[in-house]
Amino acid sequence: MEKDKILFVTQEIIPYLPENKISHIGRYLPQGMQERDCEIRTFMPRFGNINERRNQLHEVIRLSGMNMVINNTDHPLIIKVASIQSARMQVYFIDNDDFFKRKFTLTDDKGHLFPDNDERCIFYARGVLETVKKLRWAPDLIHCHGWFSALVPLYVKKAFKEDPIFDHAKIVFSIYDQAFEGTLNKDFIKKIPIDDITTKDIKLIENPTYNNLIKLAIQYSDAVVLGDEHIHSEIIDYLNQKQLPFIYHPNEENYIEAYNNFYDSL
Protein backbone atom coordinates (compact mmCIF):
# COMPACT_ATOMS: atom_id res chain seq x y z
CA MET A 1 0.00 0.00 0.00
CA GLU A 2 0.98 3.62 -0.31
CA LYS A 3 2.08 4.73 3.13
CA ASP A 4 2.81 8.41 2.66
CA LYS A 5 1.10 9.35 5.93
CA ILE A 6 1.56 7.26 9.07
CA LEU A 7 -0.09 7.93 12.43
CA PHE A 8 1.75 6.42 15.40
CA VAL A 9 -0.30 5.97 18.59
CA THR A 10 1.78 4.71 21.49
CA GLN A 11 1.74 4.75 25.27
CA GLU A 12 5.44 5.46 25.87
CA ILE A 13 8.25 7.28 24.05
CA ILE A 14 11.79 8.07 25.18
CA PRO A 15 13.02 10.58 26.36
CA TYR A 16 9.68 11.45 27.97
CA LEU A 17 9.43 8.13 29.85
CA PRO A 18 12.11 5.56 30.79
CA GLU A 19 13.50 3.33 28.06
CA ASN A 20 11.96 -0.07 27.43
CA LYS A 21 11.02 -1.92 24.26
CA ILE A 22 7.82 0.01 23.57
CA SER A 23 9.28 3.45 24.36
CA HIS A 24 12.33 2.72 22.20
CA ILE A 25 10.20 1.68 19.21
CA GLY A 26 7.90 4.65 19.87
CA ARG A 27 10.89 6.96 19.54
CA TYR A 28 12.86 5.51 16.63
CA LEU A 29 10.29 3.87 14.32
CA PRO A 30 8.55 7.19 13.48
CA GLN A 31 11.93 8.79 12.83
CA GLY A 32 12.94 5.90 10.57
CA MET A 33 9.77 6.20 8.52
CA GLN A 34 10.13 9.98 8.31
CA GLU A 35 13.64 9.46 6.94
CA ARG A 36 12.03 7.27 4.26
CA ASP A 37 9.99 10.27 3.12
CA CYS A 38 6.80 9.42 4.99
CA GLU A 39 4.77 12.12 6.67
CA ILE A 40 4.23 11.17 10.31
CA ARG A 41 2.22 12.22 13.35
CA THR A 42 3.05 10.70 16.74
CA PHE A 43 0.87 10.68 19.87
CA MET A 44 1.29 9.57 23.47
CA PRO A 45 -0.48 10.31 26.79
CA ARG A 46 0.82 13.24 28.84
CA PHE A 47 1.34 11.17 31.97
CA GLY A 48 1.96 13.22 35.12
CA ASN A 49 5.49 11.90 35.59
CA ILE A 50 6.63 13.55 32.34
CA ASN A 51 8.69 16.65 33.10
CA GLU A 52 6.99 19.37 31.05
CA ARG A 53 9.61 22.03 31.67
CA ARG A 54 12.64 19.89 30.87
CA ASN A 55 10.99 18.48 27.75
CA GLN A 56 9.52 21.85 26.72
CA LEU A 57 5.92 20.76 26.30
CA HIS A 58 3.48 23.52 25.44
CA GLU A 59 -0.25 23.59 24.84
CA VAL A 60 -1.66 23.89 21.32
CA ILE A 61 -4.64 26.16 21.96
CA ARG A 62 -6.23 25.67 18.53
CA LEU A 63 -6.41 21.89 19.08
CA SER A 64 -7.49 21.97 22.74
CA GLY A 65 -10.87 22.71 24.25
CA MET A 66 -13.12 19.87 23.12
CA ASN A 67 -15.16 18.17 25.84
CA MET A 68 -15.44 14.40 25.65
CA VAL A 69 -18.26 12.71 27.52
CA ILE A 70 -17.34 9.43 29.18
CA ASN A 71 -19.77 7.74 31.58
CA ASN A 72 -21.96 10.88 31.56
CA THR A 73 -19.09 13.14 32.67
CA ASP A 74 -17.46 15.90 30.60
CA HIS A 75 -13.67 15.74 30.32
CA PRO A 76 -11.82 18.63 28.59
CA LEU A 77 -9.26 17.58 25.98
CA ILE A 78 -5.91 19.37 26.24
CA ILE A 79 -3.33 18.94 23.47
CA LYS A 80 0.34 19.61 24.06
CA VAL A 81 3.32 19.25 21.78
CA ALA A 82 7.08 18.89 22.10
CA SER A 83 9.93 18.47 19.63
CA ILE A 84 12.72 15.94 19.48
CA GLN A 85 15.21 18.27 17.84
CA SER A 86 17.76 15.64 16.82
CA ALA A 87 15.07 13.83 14.82
CA ARG A 88 13.20 16.94 13.62
CA MET A 89 10.12 15.20 14.96
CA GLN A 90 7.12 16.50 16.89
CA VAL A 91 5.23 14.50 19.50
CA TYR A 92 1.62 15.31 20.41
CA PHE A 93 0.43 14.66 23.97
CA ILE A 94 -3.14 13.92 25.04
CA ASP A 95 -3.77 15.57 28.40
CA ASN A 96 -6.56 16.04 30.93
CA ASP A 97 -6.37 17.05 34.59
CA ASP A 98 -8.69 14.26 35.77
CA PHE A 99 -6.81 11.48 34.02
CA PHE A 100 -3.16 12.50 33.69
CA LYS A 101 -2.26 14.80 36.59
CA ARG A 102 -1.04 12.01 38.93
CA LYS A 103 2.72 11.39 38.95
CA PHE A 104 2.47 7.84 37.60
CA THR A 105 1.63 6.11 34.33
CA LEU A 106 -0.77 3.16 34.60
CA THR A 107 -0.13 1.88 38.13
CA ASP A 108 0.30 3.47 41.55
CA ASP A 109 3.40 3.29 43.76
CA LYS A 110 2.37 -0.21 44.88
CA GLY A 111 2.04 -1.46 41.30
CA HIS A 112 -1.76 -1.57 41.33
CA LEU A 113 -3.74 -0.52 38.25
CA PHE A 114 -5.57 2.76 38.63
CA PRO A 115 -9.33 2.08 38.93
CA ASP A 116 -10.10 4.61 36.17
CA ASN A 117 -7.64 3.15 33.62
CA ASP A 118 -10.64 2.10 31.54
CA GLU A 119 -11.81 5.71 31.18
CA ARG A 120 -8.24 6.94 30.66
CA CYS A 121 -7.88 4.41 27.83
CA ILE A 122 -11.15 5.58 26.23
CA PHE A 123 -10.18 9.24 26.57
CA TYR A 124 -6.77 8.64 25.02
CA ALA A 125 -8.07 6.75 21.97
CA ARG A 126 -10.87 9.19 21.25
CA GLY A 127 -8.62 12.17 21.99
CA VAL A 128 -6.05 11.08 19.42
CA LEU A 129 -8.65 10.54 16.71
CA GLU A 130 -10.51 13.80 17.38
CA THR A 131 -7.21 15.69 17.25
CA VAL A 132 -6.22 14.08 13.94
CA LYS A 133 -9.61 15.16 12.58
CA LYS A 134 -8.94 18.73 13.74
CA LEU A 135 -5.59 18.61 11.98
CA ARG A 136 -7.44 17.60 8.77
CA TRP A 137 -4.70 15.07 8.20
CA ALA A 138 -5.80 11.74 6.71
CA PRO A 139 -3.41 8.88 7.58
CA ASP A 140 -2.87 6.01 5.17
CA LEU A 141 -1.72 3.78 8.01
CA ILE A 142 -2.26 3.85 11.78
CA HIS A 143 0.23 1.94 13.93
CA CYS A 144 -0.83 1.44 17.56
CA HIS A 145 1.59 0.29 20.26
CA GLY A 146 0.59 -1.26 23.58
CA TRP A 147 -2.64 -2.02 25.40
CA PHE A 148 -3.38 1.62 26.28
CA SER A 149 -3.95 2.25 22.55
CA ALA A 150 -6.09 -0.88 22.10
CA LEU A 151 -9.39 0.94 21.49
CA VAL A 152 -8.09 2.92 18.52
CA PRO A 153 -8.76 0.13 15.96
CA LEU A 154 -12.35 -0.25 17.23
CA TYR A 155 -13.11 3.47 17.06
CA VAL A 156 -11.58 3.83 13.59
CA LYS A 157 -13.40 0.82 12.13
CA LYS A 158 -16.79 1.39 13.80
CA ALA A 159 -17.29 4.99 14.99
CA PHE A 160 -15.25 6.73 12.27
CA LYS A 161 -15.69 4.25 9.42
CA GLU A 162 -17.40 6.78 7.14
CA ASP A 163 -15.21 9.73 8.09
CA PRO A 164 -13.07 10.75 5.08
CA ILE A 165 -10.10 11.28 7.42
CA PHE A 166 -10.04 7.60 8.39
CA ASP A 167 -12.11 5.64 5.88
CA HIS A 168 -9.13 4.32 3.90
CA ALA A 169 -6.61 3.85 6.74
CA LYS A 170 -5.03 0.46 7.44
CA ILE A 171 -4.42 -0.37 11.09
CA VAL A 172 -1.41 -2.21 12.53
CA PHE A 173 -1.42 -3.17 16.21
CA SER A 174 1.79 -4.02 18.08
CA ILE A 175 1.53 -6.37 21.06
CA TYR A 176 4.13 -6.30 23.83
CA ASP A 177 4.81 -8.37 26.94
CA GLN A 178 3.01 -6.00 29.30
CA ALA A 179 0.09 -8.04 30.65
CA PHE A 180 -1.58 -6.74 33.80
CA GLU A 181 -3.11 -8.79 36.60
CA GLY A 182 -6.84 -8.74 37.18
CA THR A 183 -9.24 -6.70 35.08
CA LEU A 184 -10.15 -3.16 34.18
CA ASN A 185 -13.39 -1.68 35.54
CA LYS A 186 -16.31 -4.09 35.09
CA ASP A 187 -18.37 -1.29 33.48
CA PHE A 188 -15.75 -0.73 30.77
CA ILE A 189 -18.02 -2.28 28.13
CA LYS A 190 -20.81 0.20 28.96
CA LYS A 191 -18.56 3.27 28.68
CA ILE A 192 -16.96 2.58 25.29
CA PRO A 193 -19.92 2.89 22.85
CA ILE A 194 -20.30 6.07 20.80
CA ASP A 195 -22.05 6.59 17.46
CA ASP A 196 -22.49 3.22 15.74
CA ILE A 197 -20.69 1.12 18.35
CA THR A 198 -22.86 -1.31 20.32
CA THR A 199 -22.01 -3.64 23.19
CA LYS A 200 -22.31 -6.49 20.67
CA ASP A 201 -19.27 -5.06 18.83
CA ILE A 202 -17.21 -5.25 22.02
CA LYS A 203 -18.55 -8.50 23.45
CA LEU A 204 -14.95 -9.72 23.77
CA ILE A 205 -14.40 -7.47 26.78
CA GLU A 206 -17.44 -8.37 28.82
CA ASN A 207 -14.65 -9.61 31.08
CA PRO A 208 -12.07 -6.81 30.62
CA THR A 209 -8.84 -8.77 31.09
CA TYR A 210 -5.58 -7.89 29.38
CA ASN A 211 -5.89 -10.80 26.94
CA ASN A 212 -9.45 -9.87 25.99
CA LEU A 213 -8.52 -6.23 25.42
CA ILE A 214 -5.68 -7.28 23.11
CA LYS A 215 -8.02 -9.64 21.26
CA LEU A 216 -10.45 -6.74 20.74
CA ALA A 217 -7.63 -4.69 19.20
CA ILE A 218 -6.74 -7.61 16.91
CA GLN A 219 -10.39 -7.99 15.88
CA TYR A 220 -10.46 -4.49 14.38
CA SER A 221 -6.90 -4.33 13.03
CA ASP A 222 -5.63 -5.17 9.54
CA ALA A 223 -2.26 -6.53 10.66
CA VAL A 224 -0.34 -7.29 13.84
CA VAL A 225 3.23 -7.06 15.12
CA LEU A 226 4.29 -9.41 17.91
CA GLY A 227 6.66 -7.01 19.62
CA ASP A 228 8.04 -9.44 22.22
CA GLU A 229 9.00 -13.10 22.32
CA HIS A 230 6.71 -13.84 25.25
CA ILE A 231 3.11 -13.27 24.14
CA HIS A 232 0.37 -15.33 25.82
CA SER A 233 -0.66 -18.42 23.82
CA GLU A 234 -4.34 -17.39 24.07
CA ILE A 235 -3.52 -14.24 22.09
CA ILE A 236 -1.44 -16.15 19.53
CA ASP A 237 -4.29 -18.65 19.05
CA TYR A 238 -6.78 -15.82 18.50
CA LEU A 239 -4.45 -14.13 16.01
CA ASN A 240 -4.12 -17.37 14.05
CA GLN A 241 -7.89 -17.80 14.12
CA LYS A 242 -8.38 -14.31 12.61
CA GLN A 243 -5.77 -15.08 9.91
CA LEU A 244 -4.35 -11.56 9.90
CA PRO A 245 -0.94 -10.78 8.42
CA PHE A 246 1.63 -10.55 11.21
CA ILE A 247 5.35 -10.35 11.83
CA TYR A 248 7.57 -10.89 14.84
CA HIS A 249 9.52 -7.81 15.85
CA PRO A 250 12.71 -8.02 13.80
CA ASN A 251 16.20 -7.72 15.25
CA GLU A 252 17.69 -4.39 16.26
CA GLU A 253 19.85 -3.97 13.18
CA ASN A 254 17.23 -3.90 10.45
CA TYR A 255 13.88 -3.38 12.14
CA ILE A 256 13.07 -0.06 10.41
CA GLU A 257 13.43 -1.67 6.99
CA ALA A 258 11.43 -4.71 8.11
CA TYR A 259 8.55 -2.50 9.28
CA ASN A 260 8.77 -0.51 6.06
CA ASN A 261 8.44 -3.72 4.01
CA PHE A 262 5.58 -4.94 6.21
CA TYR A 263 3.69 -1.68 5.72
CA ASP A 264 4.25 -1.98 1.96
CA SER A 265 2.73 -5.47 1.95
CA LEU A 266 -0.63 -4.37 3.36
Predicted regions: what is each one?
Residues 1-266:
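Catalytic cores of nucleotide-sugar-dependent glycosyltransferases that transfer UDP/GDP/TDP-activated
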